UniProtKB/Swiss-Prot annotation:
A GO biological-process term: regulation of protein catabolic process
One Gene Ontology molecular-function label: enzyme regulator activity
Region annotation Disordered: where it falls in the sequence: 462-484
Oligomer status and interactors: The 26S proteasome is composed of a core protease, known as the 20S proteasome, capped at one or both ends by the 19S regulatory complex (RC). The RC is composed of at least 18 different subunits in two subcomplexes, the base and the lid, which form the portions proximal and distal to the 20S proteolytic core, respectively.
Alphabetical list of Pfam families matching this protein: PCI, Rpn3_C
Keyword Transmembrane helix: no
Taxonomic superkingdom: Eukaryota
Domain PCI: 253-432
GO CC annotations, alphabetized: proteasome regulatory particle, lid subcomplex
Protein name: Probable 26S proteasome non-ATPase regulatory subunit 3
Described purpose of this protein according to its UniProt entry: Acts as a regulatory subunit of the 26 proteasome which is involved in the ATP-dependent degradation of ubiquitinated proteins.
Keywords: Proteasome
Length: 500
């Protein structure tokens, strides 16, 4: 009896669960279709913005579209791309063009999905800029799918299309295409093959005053040289080319980072540190976490080479804590002047340092570790023998310690004297730093930075054209006009009185 009553209860309880699961699946499918519909409508709006920029000759509309590319690339599903391709290439020989080769499993004779067709989209042919933008979206989608063979062919076709056009309205889209063309070659480990092409496009962009194209191409060439550790060629490119001041913040940040790497490799650590800090400030503070991690690693190494110790709060940032772990241990080894720990850090994280392109600079830190250790010894002891110094530094012989101490005294690391006859090093009393020019120089550096920042901010502001002020009347003209209006009103009032 119990089993007979329990069976219908269990059946009744299980039925709503099935309904809920079916409803949730239907809701998910509906939400997916809605997202695809919104994505197609958004990219259509981008095409309208590009057409508007071409007609009005105002490039800021295209710039607005390109700024939303990181958001758009996450919405490039197969249905979205296929729907846009059906609209852009509805019939004729263009329907069998190169673009369809990069849309997988979407037959050329297929119809557009229901709800995604815009009747007004087939009335007029699209502009060349819209075609290049759609081709760029296909390339970005192939890169996200890691389909390098198709991405390589797509990139080559896109470059052929860009080079064959001589339209100034295409410059901003072409600049973005150059970046992704270089990215495809980098993923294929074939950057050297496109170097001459990038140089030729840089000459063309310079002659046409294409500032965004110049900035992108200079950065691509610098990345190309630095990928193969060609620092001399990169330095020559920087000296012989002019990076445009009107370039976007992202391109400026990239250029400053590459410039910092070049200067650090050429032992110009102060200049390198200045460029890298500016790159961090120009980079997006919320997005571009990978770029900030890369720059911050190099900043830490350069600061250590300058003899400074980075603040602990740098390593505590949530987005940087994990990636800066090896550099935190490196900083501790340098701060304590511990050669043994420095060697352990190199042994444990050497491969990661090589991937970060900081291993060569970190090798130079060994001298800084020794200098830090000698400075600590000089502060702790007023008199110490070379044998004790060799034992503390882990050196093989007292002669090596004596040589290192002599070099440190000559470089100004410590203020001491070395007495070989009596066999000890005597440290002099420390001087007051405020009696030197160092505080004045540091204050001057900060004031100069503030003034430069103010000047750059003023230059970046947009002002109305000078002709705008001519249309506005001055205060004196306004008073004269008001006086004339008052006189005219009085005359009209007197005439009315005369009529009565």
């Amino acid at each position: 009896m119990v089993s007979q009553t329990a069976t219908p209860t269990a059946t009744a309880a299980s039925e709503p669960i099935v309904d809920v699961e079916m409803e949730s699946a239907e809701d998910a499918e509906t939400a997916k279709k809605d997202a695809e519909l919104l994505a197609v409508q958004e990219i259509r709006d981008h095409a309208r913005q590009i057409d508007k920029a071409v007609v009005s000759k105002e490039p800021r509309f295209i710039l607005r579209v390109l700024r939303s590319l990181p958001t758009t690339r996450r919405k490039l599903a197969l249905v979205v791309v296929g729907s846009l391709a059906v609209q852009l290439y509805p019939a004729g020989p263009e329907r069998d063009g190169n673009q369809w080769a990069y849309i997988e499993d979407y037959p050329a004779g297929a119809q557009e999905p229901e709800g995604l067709h815009d009747p007004g989209s087939d009335k007029s042919p699209f502009a060349q800029e819209v075609d290049a933008y759609f081709h760029l979206l296909l390339l970005v989608r192939l890169l996200d799918k890691n389909d390098l063979p198709k991405a390589t062919k797509c990139s080559q076709d896109l470059m052929a299309k860009i080079v064959g056009q001589n339209r100034r309205s295409l410059d901003l889209i072409a600049a973005k295409c150059y970046f992704y063309h270089s990215r495809v070659s980098e993923l294929n480990n074939d950057l050297e093959s496109i170097r001459s092409f990038l140089h030729s496009r840089l000459r063309t962009a310079t002659l046409r005053n294409d500032f965004e194209g110049q900035a992108v191409l200079i950065n691509c060439l610098l990345r190309n040289y630095l990928h193969y550790s060609l620092y001399d060629q990169a330095d020559k490119l920087v000296n012989k080319s002019v990076f445009p001041e009107t370039a976007s913040n992202n391109e400026c940040a990239r250029f400053l980072y590459y410039l910092g790497r070049i200067k650090a490799a050429k032992l110009e650590y102060s200049v390198a540190h200045k460029q890298l800090v500016q790159a961090l400030r120009k980079a997006p503070q919320q997005a571009a976490v990978g770029f900030r991690q890369t720059v911050q690693k190099l900043v830490i190494v350069v600061e250590l080479l300058l003899g400074d110790i980075p603040e602990r709060k740098v390593f505590r940032q949530a987005a940087l804590r994990r990636s800066l772990g090896p550099y935190f241990q490196l900083t501790q080894a340098v701060r304590m002047g511990n050669l043994q720990r420095f060697g352990e850090v190199l042994e444990n994280f050497g491969e990661q340092f090589r991937q970060d392109h900081t291993f060569t600079l970190i090798i130079r830190l060994r001298h800084n570790v020794i200098k830090t250790a000698i400075r600590s010894i000089g502060l702790a002891y007023s008199r110490i023998s070379p044998q004790d110094i060799a034992r503390k530094l882990g050196l093989d012989s007292p002669e090596d310690a004596e040589f290192i101490v002599a070099k440190a005294i000559r470089d100004g690391v410590i203020d001491a004297t070395l007495d070989p006859e009596k066999g000890y090093m005597r440290t002099k009393e420390s001087t007051d730093i405020y009696s030197t020019r160092e505080p004045q120089l540091a204050f001057h550096q900060r004031i100069s930075f503030c003034l430069d920042l103010h000047n750059q901010s003023v230059k970046a502001m947009r002002y109305p054209p000078k002709s705008y002020g001519k249309e506005l009347e001055s205060a004196e003209e306004r008073r004269e006009r008001e006086q004339q209006d008052l006189e005219l009103a009085k005359e009209m009032a007197e005439e009315d009185d005369d009529d009565f």
